[in-house]
């Protein structure tokens, strides 16, 4: 279970700690394999739920950590990571709103800040060697703290399964709520919760009802729709049903409203950064409503070329966030450019929630480029349809010349 040569160079390490099976095993493993190394547990509160934090400090100390730092990042996470990313229109492979991916840079940044505060010379994470998160965390560490050593136990130890980890903890009399029967790997934050593993590893299996934990089954959702109104300023949701709210509070309220209607469920097979495909089920109720509202206002206020540019930026931004490249010059540039475009994304939207769907049914904006007078199919006084003839001749000129040359 250990590495061959015990390390004596690392004096103090900050571990990204959740209290789950993996990180519970990492603390004693570090003590056994890194001589005289002090272990500082760090937990980022990104809205995963109070139940995940209860007793966490005591558990970390009982496992062998000397300190446990729980840092409240909820408001910062929504304000400085979720809102700016959504303003770019980022959505990975057409469906994934990047709930897990967006959380990694803020967690890594806070972990580095704790390391600097306590004078640590190493950072440690519990990401597996098959997943995206190892790249995301270590990419952020490289950008923020290239001088600190990174320890990745899953790439060092010989344990290969949940059963191995459970046996390892049992041998050391370390208690854990994990068990071999808990088959799903879950990751939660204020924006979403992800589910992987178990029967989901076979794409021919429909997800069982036990997979989903945050949203109602659309089949069991209310038979009557619910309407929710959102006010948007500069591409940010500022009010929900007329109530002015902070970014985090707005997201929480939308989660509570949308989840009972089964909104925000997706079941996707995505291309991981490390080359393999993986299947995940994601629940993003409030974020799905926000995304629908922002897109609705963009339809009103962005001209054709601006909207095309925003879609291109959104696609590029989705890959940057998914691939762990938040702290890069390109990401910074795309965020800044999107802020300029978001200055016109203002207005109100009413979203209809019904059995898994979130549909924008009303929208208005003081910056709207839509004119009923110009768009009407009835008799109008502001648009001379004869003007279209000259435009069409110029627009199709290249095609006309090509056809004439071909004769």
Curated annotation (Swiss-Prot):
Its EC number is 6.3.4.5. L-aspartate binds at residues 128, 132-133. Keywords: Amino-acid biosynthesis, Arginine biosynthesis, ATP-binding, Cytoplasm, Ligase, Nucleotide-binding. L-citrulline binds at residues 96, 101, 132, 136, 185, 194, 270, 282. GO terms for cellular component: cytoplasm. It is found in: Cytoplasm. The keyword Nucleotide-binding applies. Pathway: Amino-acid biosynthesis; L-arginine biosynthesis; L-arginine from L-ornithine and carbamoyl phosphate: step 2/3. GO terms for biological process: argininosuccinate metabolic process; L-arginine biosynthetic process; urea cycle. Pfam families: Arginosuc_syn_C, Arginosuc_synth. ATP binds at residues 16-24, 44, 126. The keyword Ligase applies. SUPFAM superfamilies: Adenine nucleotide alpha hydrolases-like, Argininosuccinate synthetase, C-terminal domain. One of its GO terms (molecular function) is ATP binding. Homotetramer. Belongs to the argininosuccinate synthase family. Type 1 subfamily. This is Argininosuccinate synthase. It comes from Shewanella sp. (strain W3-18-1).
């Amino acid at each position: 279970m250990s590495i061959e040569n015990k390390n004596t160079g690392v004096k103090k390490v900050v571990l990204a700690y959740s209290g789950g099976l993996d990180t519970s095993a990492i603390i004693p493993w570090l003590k056994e394999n890194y001589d005289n190394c002090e272990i500082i547990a760090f937990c980022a509160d990104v809205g995963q739920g109070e139940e995940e934090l209860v007793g966490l400090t005591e558990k970390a100390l009982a496992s062998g950590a000397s300190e446990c730092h729980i840092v409240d990042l909820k408001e910062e996470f929504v304000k400085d990571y979720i809102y700016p990313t959504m303003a770019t229109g980022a959505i990975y492979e057409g469906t994934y709103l990047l709930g897990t991916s967006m959380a990694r840079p803020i967690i890594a940044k806070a972990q580095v800040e704790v390391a600097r505060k306590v004078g640590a010379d190493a950072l440690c994470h519990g990401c597996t060697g098959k997943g995206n998160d190892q790249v995301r965390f270590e990419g952020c560490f490289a950008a923020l703290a290239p001088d600190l050593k990174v320890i990745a136990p899953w790439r060092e130890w010989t344990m290969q399964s949940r059963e191995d980890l459970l046996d390892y903890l049992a041998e050391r009399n370390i208690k854990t709520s994990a068990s071999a029967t808990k088959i799903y790997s879950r990751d939660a934050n204020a924006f979403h919760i992800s589910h992987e593993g178990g029967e989901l590893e076979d794409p021919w299996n429909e997800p069982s009802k036990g997979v989903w934990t945050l949203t109602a089954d659309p089949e069991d959702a209310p038979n009557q729709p619910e309407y929710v109104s959102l006010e948007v300023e500069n591409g940010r949701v500022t009010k929900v049903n007329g109530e002015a709210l902070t970014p985090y509070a707005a997201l929480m309220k939308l989660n509570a409203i949308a989840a009972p209607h089964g909104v925000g469920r997706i079941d996707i097979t995505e291309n991981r950064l490390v080359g393999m495909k993986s299947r995940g089920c994601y629940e993003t109720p409030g974020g799905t409503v926000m995304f629908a509202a922002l897109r609705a206002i963009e339809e009103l206020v962005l001209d054709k070329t601006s909207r095309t540019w925003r879609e291109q930026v959104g696609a590029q931004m989705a890959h940057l966030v998914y691939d762990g490249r938040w702290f890069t010059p390109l990401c910074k540039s795309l965020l800044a450019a999107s802020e300029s475009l978001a200055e016109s994304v203002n207005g109100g939207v009413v979203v209809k929630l019904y059995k898994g769907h979130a549909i924008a049914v009303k929208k208005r904006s003081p910056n709207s480029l839509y004119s009923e007078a110009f768009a009407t199919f009835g008799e109008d006084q502001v648009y001379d349809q004869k003007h279209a003839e000259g435009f069409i001749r110029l627009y199709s000129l290249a095609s006309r010349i090509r056809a004439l040359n071909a004769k």
